[in-house]
Each structure stands twice: as C-alpha cells, then as structure tokens.
Amino acid sequence: MSYRDYLRDVVKADAAAITLYEARPHGEWGVGADAVSALDVWAFDFPGFQGLRLAPGSAPHMGYTASGYADGGSYTFHFPDGNASIARLLVRHLIPDSLPGKNAEDVVAARLDYGRLDRPRAPVRIRLNASAVRVRHDGDAASAGDVEIVYARGGALSSVRSRACVLACYNMIIPYLCPELPERQKAALRYASKIPLIYVSVALRDWRAFKDLGVSQVYAPASYFSSLALNEVVDIGGYASTRSPDEPVLVHMTRVPTAPGLPEREQHRIGRQDILSTSFATYERNIRDQLDRTLGPGGFDAARDITAITVNRWPHGYAYEYNPLFDPDWPPGEAPHEIGRARFGRIAVANSDAAAAAYTDAAIDQAHRAVAELLGA
C-alpha cells in the first residue's frame, strides 16, 4: 500500500491534508507519496502511524533505506563536502605523498598535489579526465589472459591492457561499454533506473533572514523546489561551520521531478528528460523567486543577498532500490542487481547499483566483493 493510499483509506485524511505530504518522500526515494510504501515511510516517522503502537525496528519487505533508518541509521555523521572526503582518503591511501595528513579529520582542508597522481613507473596511477568507452577480453572470455580498455582523453583514443578489470560505472551504461556480456546479464543491468535529482547550492552573503524567521529548513510541497535548508553544522579538523548569522553560508535546495501515478522506474525516466530539457535560466528564476517568497518576510532580497548559484543536475542520481509496490519479490540470487554483478571472465562489476542501495558503504562492500572474485579467479 502506498503512503498516499494509507493516508486516504486507513487514516481517512482529507485530500487537502494529503497534499501536504505528497513531496515528503522526495529526498529519500525520488518519488512522491503515490509511489512509496507506507511501511517504508513509517520507518522515517512520517505522520499517520503513531496510534498503531508498532514496535520499532526494521520489518520484512521494508526497503534498504527504510531498514537502515529503522535500525538506528542517521544522516548526522557526514563530511562537510559529502563523499569527496572519502574519495580523498582513498587516494591518500593509494598514493600517500599526493595528499598531506594522516586521518579523517585533516583530509577535508588538505590540498591535493595533482601532479603526483599519474607518474611513470608508480605502483598506482590515477588518470583524470579519461573516460572508458570500450572494455573487452583479448579473446574468449573463458580463456583470455588480458582485458583491453579503450578510453578517450583530450580528443584522442588510447588503450591499456590489464590482467583484470572492475567496471565501477553505473549499471545502465555497462551493456554499451562491454557489449560482449551475456544477454541475460545485460538485460539485468538495464533493469534499474537511477533516481534523477537536482541539488542546488546557493551562496548567500549572510543567513540573517533564517535567523530572524527562526527557521533552518523549509519544506514546500507545491513549490518548484520541495525543500531548502541550511546545512547541518559539521566541525572537523580545520573546518568549522558558520556560527554567526552575519557570515556567508550555503543553502541547499532540492528538486525531484516526478510523474505521479506512474510506476517508479517510468517516473524516473520522465524526470530525467525534465532535467535534461530545463535551462539554467529556468532554474535560476525559480531559485530567486522561491527564496524571495520564503525568506522575504525576514528581510531577504535575492538581488542583494545571493552571491553565487550552482545547479547540480543529477539525471542518473541515487541507485535504484527495489520498490515493493512495483517490483516482484525475486528468489535469492535472481534479482537483477545480483545477475548484473556476476563476474564475466576477467571483468567484474562493482557500484551502488550492484547492491541495489544508494549508499557509500554498499558501494565499498561491492568493491571488496569484486576484487575478491578477480583475485580468486
């Protein structure tokens, strides 16, 4: 049962009241109340369940995200730059002299020496701005001794050979990158449809309007952006969040284009087209208008107070997590993400799609599995 149906048919909520919660699931699931299960949103303490007196904790048929939060997960612990610090920690472990420091606290503000990433004869080389365009075995996959990787860089194609290869890009592109994969595996890789998202960062000269209005975040279910918020305070190492409302700040705004009433994967495809066909001017106009209308009573003036805008278009955003409203309950080993991540000769697959979970730890677990498969081959 969807959350919308639950509010309408079980809670008997008024249609106008239900409208207030239509966009509430956007940030986690990329769909509205029509396409997320009531069980999943219960784990997030959405309204409508308090009288049921349900025991806390995850439950069967609950999605990955909901299960994690139901069992105590939280967004509280994160780096101020998101997953960038995790990537930088990995680079420092692989190429120690590329980044100063020794722990997670000092990595945020450390300056990377890009000249040390791709040095001849180094045991680890990271080649930036190099996009893989073809991966294939040198011969039959069952007996080949090498894998050829062709990549594009600076308008030219180059190739390298490797004893093994991990495809860590998102699943849907892999059948085009490696067309020699078995047809069943390629179909499984195409199954999921990543969640399209728009994340906007707006730099303000101060956050006095938030302070004077007594708010740090605003949920706006019928607006172009369903939410806007100041980032949570994160102090780590030499990085400190703003404390004074007279200091500059970044505001995070979220838009998730949906098509209510359709199955989730179809909504994501339509949302992706919406993102790719919308101009920056349209985003900017809506950003300025919504901030003026929301914060104007606190003295905010978009023309005066906005110093920069970054629109992050993420047409292929979060990994797809199976939705009990639309996806079957596959037997163990038969779900698309399990079929899609199967090792093929000297080629393995590892990403968040391979776990059907949009989280860093899930992607790291899949990387560990993929490398172990190749080392044991």
PLM regions with names:
Residues M1-A130, A141:
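Active-site/ligand-binding neighborhood in enzyme catalytic cores
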Residues R4-R8, A87-V91, I95, C178, ...:
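Non-transmembrane alpha-helical segments in soluble domains
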Residues D34-V41, Y64-T65, Y176-E180, L213-G214, ...:
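Short, solvent-exposed loop/turn and secondary-structure capping segments
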Residues D71-G82, I86, L157, C165, ...:
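Conserved aromatic-histidine-acidic binding/catalytic patches
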Residues D113-A122, S131-V150, R313-G333:
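Charged, often glycine-rich, active-site loop that binds/positions anionic groups
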Residues P120, V124, L128-G261:
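Mid-domain catalytic core of redox enzymes
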Residues Y151, A203, A209-A377:
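Conserved flavin/dinucleotide-binding core of flavoenzymes
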